[in-house]
Amino acid sequence: MAKLVFSLCFLLFSGCCFAFSSREQPQQNECQIQKLNALKPDNRIESEGGLIETWNPNNKPFQCAGVALSRCTLNRNALRRPSYTNGPQEIYIQQGKGIFGMIYPGCPSTFEEPQQPQQRGQSSRPQDRHQKIYNFREGDLIAVPTGVAWWMYNNEDTPVVAVSIIDTNSLENQLDQMPRRFYLAGNQEQEFLKYQQEQGGHQSQKGKHQQEEENEGGSILSGFTLEFLEHAFSVDKQIAKNLQGENEGEDKGAIVTVKGGLSVIKPPTDEQQQRPQEEEEEEEDEKPQCKGKDKHCQRPRGSQSKSRRNGIDETICTMRLRHNIGQTSSPDIYNPQAGSVTTATSLDFPALSWLRLSAEFGSLRKNAMFVPHYNLNANSIIYALNGRALIQVVNCNGERVFDGELQEGRVLIVPQNFVVAARSQSDNFEYVSFKTNDTPMIGTLAGANSLLNALPEEVIQHTFNLKSQQARQIKNNNPFKFLVPPQESQKRAVA
């Protein structure tokens, strides 16, 4: 009973923390940016089953946005070891499919191994029970709250590529602004430790040698003594050494290869799961509704359990953790000649309200343009998934702080209120944009419903020193709201 009360208290406390999390303000002058660059990863850490690449979080644009960015590649049968971070995370699946799990303290283990028939003379083996496992596929956005441990596994031939950000400016991060990943197992190199030590300034030769040793990394369990681990887990010394990672090769790293594949209790795929859910909903609709105390009326399944629920289990332990915004999803903005945009905010993906983050997937056809626009209440971290685009960014002084190409695999950070416009240079430019607000808003400067379109004609005329007819053209010539087709397409449409 005491254990149950503790769990409920923890869940209530966690729910409150997640729900009211916000962001700290960047330090003074961190957003006084005169020049932006399209950045590629500058650190690469190879493991047995894949690799992890990171961008330097000490770069000024990352400091301004208050985020850290990394990219993980998992080969066939590769398992990314469980870890948690000091800030909330968003993970976008650029390629591949597989399974992942999260471990919420206080939530029940609902996946249970089937009971095996016991042979005569054999001792019974405890059934494996664990928390829920989820499928993921290309285009999925995965929400990971602060301090929640998660793992990921690739059970297909195609390598999994996952891009993720950590919000280090979140108020849930009670440490400094440096991203930190806490691994539960292994002796892998910490992907952000290098930058943490660089931030400390120049070191002596002795200090550099010590840094190289520290960069070898380790898990949180490797720091405890054998005696403590034996006592805590009730295991012998040999198992305790394995918990420390003492008997492990240095080349395994944060991503290990599971020989023969991972055998766990996992959910059906999306295709297998869709039809049973539809049939169950149809059965619920066909059942009669009970009124009053009619004992002969058959109540719908789950009605009794629903009446006993207190809401905690639904808001934390069973919340939806992934949401697809890729090419296969229904776009929020669509122009057949220009492209499409799909967003994920806390309005359609409630888990994001705990992270205070959101994301946007966009696809632009060749020479199509996303009109000049700005984020009212968020920084934008734009990662190019495919193709290339010409992008211009302007700051508050009217200076072009970026005027160049954003190519596949590179990232461009656009601070809040900086104005950005993009035009695709390839047949299909695709990007994902992480935003530091769960309900981001954008304002467009051109096209229908834009700022200039909403101004009175005479205000435009006198503001820009134009003739009346010219002001009217600015207001009415572009009928598109966000995405503008190539100019030749517009000319053909007018003709």
UniProtKB/Swiss-Prot annotation:
InterPro entries associated with the record: 11S_seedstore_CS, 11S_seedstore_pln, Cupin_1, RmlC-like_jellyroll, RmlC_Cupin_sf, Seed_Storage-Functional
Primary site of residence: endoplasmic reticulum
Motif interval(s): Vacuolar targeting signal: 486-495
Biotechnological relevance of this protein: Emulsification efficiency of glycinin is improved by degree-dependent glycation with soy soluble polysaccharide (SSPS) at 60 degrees Celsius in both the acidic (A) and basic (B) polypeptides as a result of subunit dissociation at the quaternary level. Thermal treatment of soybean seed proteins leads to the aggregation of glycinin acidic and basic polypeptides (GAP and GBP, respectively). GBP improve sensory properties of meat (e.g. pork) during chilled storage and inhibit bacterial growth (e.g. L.monocytogenes, B.subtilis, E.coli and S.enteritidis).
PTM note: During soybean germination, seed storage proteins are hydrolyzed by protease/26S proteasome. The precursor is post-translationally processed to form a covalently linked A1a-Bx subunit complex.
Annotated signal sequence range: 1-19
PANTHER family: GLYCININ G3 (PTHR31189:SF77), OS03G0336100 PROTEIN-RELATED (PTHR31189)
Subunit structure: Hexamer; each subunit is composed of an acidic and a basic chain derived from a single precursor and linked by a disulfide bond. Interacts with the vacuolar-sorting receptor VSR via its vacuolar targeting signal.
Protein name per UniProt: Glycinin G1
Source species: Glycine max (Soybean)
